[in-house]
C-alpha cells in the first residue's frame, strides 16, 4: 500500500508539473500562437516573431525559468538556444486536417516533437471532437509511429 500511495503521489506530481525533487516547474509564455507578424507590430514589437520569442526566452531562462512556451514553429530554435534541459511547451498543436481555429503558428504533434518540444498542448482538436477519446488516441498513435 505504501508503494501504491507513493506511485500515485509521483503520478499526481508529474501531472502538476512537479519534478522528482518536488520543485514546481516554471515556464514563461513568449508570443501567443494566435499572433502573426502584424499582430506583433500592433503591440509595438518591430522585430520578427522568431526574434521576439528568442529574446523573451533568453530573458526568462536566464532569470531562472525552467523553459518557454512557444509555437512549434519556434521549438527547434528554442531547443538550440536554451539547450537540452529546457522545457519547451508548444501550444498550437493540431493533427493533420484539424481546424486551425484562431491559431496561426501551428504544427502536427509529430512535427512539434521532432522540432524539440518537451510538452504538447492540444486543446480544441480533442475537446471539440465528436469523440474526444478517439481524437486523443489518434494523436498518441501518430506519435508512436
Question: Which ranges hold each PLM region?
Answer:
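C-terminal helical cap(s) of enzyme catalytic domains, especially alpha/beta-barrels
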Residues: 2, 6-8, 12, 113, ...
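Short secondary-structure boundary/capping elements
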Residues: 48, 70, 101-105
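Hydrophobic faces of well-ordered beta-strands that scaffold small-molecule active sites
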Residues: 26-30, 68-69, 87-93, 120-122
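Alpha-helix capping/helix-boundary segments
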Residues: 74-75, 126
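Glycine-rich phosphate-binding active-site loops on the catalytic face of alpha/beta enzymes
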Residues: 94-96, 102-135
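Conserved anion-binding
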Residues: 1-63, 74, 84-85, 95-98
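Small-residue (G/A/S/T)-rich helix-start motifs and N-terminal tracts that mark the onset
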Residues: 82, 119-120, 139, 145
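Conserved, mostly hydrophobic/aromatic
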Residues: 60, 78, 112, 123, ...
Amino acid at each position: 500500500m505504501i508503494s501504491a500511495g507513493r506511485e500515485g503521489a509521483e503520478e499526481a506530481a508529474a501531472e502538476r508539473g512537479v519534478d522528482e525533487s518536488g520543485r514546481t516547474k516554471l515556464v514563461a509564455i513568449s508570443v501567443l500562437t494566435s499572433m502573426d507578424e502584424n499582430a506583433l507590430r500592433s503591440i509595438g514589437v518591430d522585430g520578427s516573431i522568431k526574434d521576439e520569442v528568442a529574446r523573451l526566452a533568453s530573458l526568462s531562462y536566464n532569470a531562472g525559468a525552467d523553459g518557454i512556451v512557444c509555437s512549434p514553429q519556434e521549438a527547434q530554435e528554442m531547443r538550440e538556444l536554451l539547450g537540452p534541459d529546457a522545457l519547451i511547451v508548444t501550444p498550437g498543436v493540431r493533427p493533420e486536417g484539424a481546424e486551425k481555429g484562431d491559431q496561426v503558428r501551428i504544427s502536427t504533434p509529430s512535427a512539434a516533437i521532432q522540432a524539440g518540444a518537451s510538452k504538447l498542448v492540444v486543446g480544441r482538436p480533442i475537446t471539440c471532437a465528436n469523440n474526444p477519446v478517439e481524437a486523443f488516441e489518434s494523436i498518441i498513435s501518430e506519435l508512436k509511429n
